[in-house]
């Protein structure tokens, strides 16, 4: 029987990431902003696709890794709104979204605490 740790490694390595995702993941790691795993990202992409999501709200942008996964599963005209308290991270996410070839019209990045921002949405 396979070891549980080996199973997790296989599962995470099984999902292929685009060059843009790999670059965003590297930036996130350099910044200390822990990105979602490939397996979690693939699950987010699948959920967005199955739901036919045209609008998604994300709390905690990081460097944009989870946002890239979500946008990949969303409708081509879908918009990701993402909130992060650290405006510096939003800048990195914006650059990672652009590097992935995404139009700025597909993302809305908001700096602030989610508890302050969400009631106004």
Regions found by a protein language model. Give the residues of each.
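A short alpha-helical cap/connector motif
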Residues: 1-121
